């Protein structure tokens, strides 16, 4: 090999030789990475199919056990209960395992994102995404408080109201997408606390299309005051729930992917019961909003379809929030009473 010429060109050639050596190392590392990736994909497929088979057999076993349980002799009942508990425990273990395996997206994620794999494969990535979701909720809640306050007390313009409602639509749409991704990654948020964000998205969309007029102005201040109060309560919930979840996770009593919610769950009983009056007041305000809208719909001057279409979601939100919270409180009192009787 000829010696490199002197001057800047020689320096460039020497740098190129060093880069060439590094590039060969990168190529080898990338080759190994692709091999490991193929091995990982095979392991994922094998693990997924094995879990699916096991879950199917567990369901069949649980069904047989349920059918034969009434006819079992009294001495076998304890063994049957023990087997039932073991089956439930195994199903919980499979749930944790599946959080680290690729899975098909649900209907909503498929419609929004297509067939993209949204499963995060490491604990660090899952926790980072969950933490980013919580921060997103906190920052947007503060922004919503400020904007609703501005619209309520400083500006009376349909344009700023529309911007506020558009922000609400975007916020709730984004929440539903992020929550669906978190559920795919092992978060245990479910039931009403997921569904009520879809209802809120619909409600905000209808509010966005409501034209300015007499009916809108009659409901405007009440809605903005409610939005301000709701965002304030959500801020309180995030602040106190995040601290409570941190303590419970440190004690091993909560899952690492558990999220703060805009309601009350059983794990909040210790330390967060002071939030209940704020929550119930907000629930009844939703009922008041629904009744106000139904009353406006009866006004002969009411021509907008948005009045009724906002009333029904507010009523649904009240019923879902109120009875879900009430069920948690009733269940806790029942468990405490049952525990004290045993003692």
Swiss-Prot record:
CoA binds at residues 130, 187-188, 237, 240-241, 283, 332. InterPro entries: TMEM120A/B (IPR012926). One of its GO terms (cellular component) is membrane. Residues 153-158, 210-218, 295-304 are extracellular. It is a multi-pass membrane protein. Residues 1-132, 178-190, 241-270, 331-343 are cytoplasmic. It holds the Pfam family TMEM120A-B. Keywords: Cell membrane, Endoplasmic reticulum, Membrane, Nucleus, Transmembrane, Transmembrane helix. GO terms for biological process: detection of mechanical stimulus involved in sensory perception of pain; fat cell differentiation; monoatomic ion transmembrane transport; protein heterooligomerization; protein homooligomerization. The transmembrane domain (TMD) has structural homology to the very long chain fatty acid elongase 7, ELOVL7, despite low sequence homology between them. Belongs to the TMEM120 family. Homodimer. Forms heterooligomer with TMEM120B. Interacts with PKD2; TMEM120A inhibits PKD2 channel activity through the physical association of PKD2 with TMEM120A. This is Transmembrane protein 120A. It comes from Bos taurus. The gene is TMEM120A.
